[in-house]
């Protein structure tokens, strides 16, 4: 994706063009050679690499080129080692630190770790053990996760609906709720 020119760069360019047009309008006869040199000065490569002095027509092109200076050049021996390291990837396993189960990809291990995290939820001691922890997400039949909160209800009404079910939800007089 190309970066847009800033308003400042655009205004400087417009000022240069306006000055050029004023100079051209004031002269009665412009030599073709002078005009060619003048137009060439605007189209020349104006962004120069400080490392190798190569010039580029856009700042983006210069940025891409400068990145090539940061990459180390591979020798023939290093290319062979890199090729061998690609073979190693197929045999590498990701191991769960909790149950020692192995997985072929880190993404699979991450999904597996979610199972351990959900079983490790610890409730603070000041919360009554009678009130179950309320899951925010539930799985529906197609294994999609859905939000189990009714956004039309207050948080208290949502909690009561979860505890007592939809069949018996006590009516709350909001005058008495702080």
From Swiss-Prot:
Q: Localized where?
A: Nucleus
In which domain of life is the source organism classified?
Answer: Eukaryota
Primary place of residence?
nucleus
- One GO cellular component, as annotated: nucleus
PROSITE patterns in alphabetical order: ZINC_FINGER_C2H2_1, ZINC_FINGER_C2H2_2
Q: Give the record's keywords alphabetically.
A: Metal-binding, Nucleus, Repeat, Transcription, Transcription regulation, Zinc, Zinc-finger
- Zn finger (C2H2-type) start-end: 47-69, 94-116
Q: Does the keyword Zinc apply?
A: yes
Q: SUPFAM superfamilies, alphabetically?
A: beta-beta-alpha zinc fingers
Give the Gene3D superfamilies listed for this entry: Classic Zinc Finger
The Swiss-Prot or TrEMBL record annotates one GO molecular function as: zinc ion binding
List the InterPro entries: Znf_C2H2_sf, Znf_C2H2_type
Q: In which tissues is it expressed?
A: Expressed in leaves.
Pfam family membership, one: zf-C2H2_6
The Gene Ontology biological process annotation of the record reads: cellular response to nickel ion; regulation of DNA-templated transcription; regulation of root development
Extract the coiled-coil ranges from the record. none
State what this protein does: Probable transcription factor that may be involved in stress responses.
Q: What is this protein called?
A: Zinc finger protein ZAT11
Q: Which gene encodes it?
A: ZAT11
């Amino acid at each position: 994706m190309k970066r847009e020119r800033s308003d400042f760069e655009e205004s400087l360019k417009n000022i240069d063009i306006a000055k050029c047009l004023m100079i051209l309008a004031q002269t009665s006869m412009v030599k073709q050679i002078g005009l060619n040199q003048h137009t060439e000065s605007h189209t020349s490569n104006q962004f120069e690499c400080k490392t190798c002095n190569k010039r580029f027509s856009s700042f983006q092109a210069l940025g891409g080129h400068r990145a090539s200076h940061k990459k180390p050049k591979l020798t023939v021996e290093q290319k062979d080692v890199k090729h061998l390291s690609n073979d190693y990837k197929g045999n590498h396993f990701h191991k769960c630190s909790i149950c020692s189960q192995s997985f072929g990809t880190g993404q699979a291990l991450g999904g597996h770790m979610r199972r351990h995290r959900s079983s490790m939820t610890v409730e603070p001691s000041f919360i009554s053990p009678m009130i179950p922890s309320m899951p925010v997400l539930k799985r529906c039949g197609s294994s999609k996760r859905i939000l189990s909160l009714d956004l039309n209800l207050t948080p208290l009404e949502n909690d009561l609906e979860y505890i007592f079910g939809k069949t018996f939800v006590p009516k709350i007089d909001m005058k008495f709720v702080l």
